């Protein structure tokens, strides 16, 4: 690593962007706006170092309709969310949804599932997994479903999927339910299931 400062700033950028779709070129552009000139090839190399050293997991996108893995716009999740708190030195309430998404990813990974982030039309599905029985499952993660806009967005993405595999919404809501084949589960209950 030739530029330690750029590498450190890149790792902080990724930590602040957990649960967001990113690419080396848009990271490079964002860092250039912050007066840090770093080429997207260097960004790609530094990300590879962070993934290979088990600081981040890289999760590819999957086009649900076309049934194929996409080559760009991955998401990155931290192996330990404590790294984020240590490096960024702050906790911001608006990040809780992304932190919850990171926790759900870690649990899906722990369960041995193959995990992708999903895309169906203009909608994003937080996680598509292939379980031990080689069956698919779909997950949306939201801090709370109490906001009607959030509920509509999360439910509509899952309803857009035209198969009969299980579909879940994971949130911090205490009251959970099943609606139109979509099971809404509390994060703590879900974590303790298996």
Annotated model-derived regions:
Residues 114, 166, 181-183:
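Conserved beta-strand segments of alpha/beta enzyme cores
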Residues 164-171:
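Short, hydrophobic beta-strand segments that form beta-sheet elements in well-ordered domains
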Residues 173-194:
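Domain-level recognition of nuclease-like catalytic cores that cleave nucleotide substrates
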């Amino acid at each position: 690593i030739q530029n330690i400062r750029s590498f450190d700033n890149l790792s902080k950028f990724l930590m602040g962007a957990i649960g967001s779709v990113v690419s080396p070129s848009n990271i490079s552009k964002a860092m250039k706006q912050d007066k840090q000139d770093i080429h997207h090839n260097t960004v790609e190399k530094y990300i590879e170092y962070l993934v290979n050293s088990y600081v981040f997991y890289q999760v590819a996108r999957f086009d649900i309709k076309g049934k194929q893995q996409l080559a760009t716009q991955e998401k990155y999740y931290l192996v330990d969310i404590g790294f984020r708190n240590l490096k960024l030195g702050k906790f911001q309430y608006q990040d809780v949804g992304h932190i919850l998404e990171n926790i759900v990813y870690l649990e899906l990974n722990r369960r041995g599932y193959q995990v992708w982030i999903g895309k169906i039309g203009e909608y994003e599905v937080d996680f598509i997994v292939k379980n031990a029985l080689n069956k698919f499952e779909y997950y949306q993660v939201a801090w709370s479903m109490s906001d009607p806009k959030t509920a509509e967005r999360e439910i509509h993405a899952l309803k857009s999927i035209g198969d009969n595999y299980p579909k879940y919404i994971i949130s911090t809501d205490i009251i959970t339910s099943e609606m139109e084949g979509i099971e809404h589960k509390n994060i703590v209950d879900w974590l303790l299931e298996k």
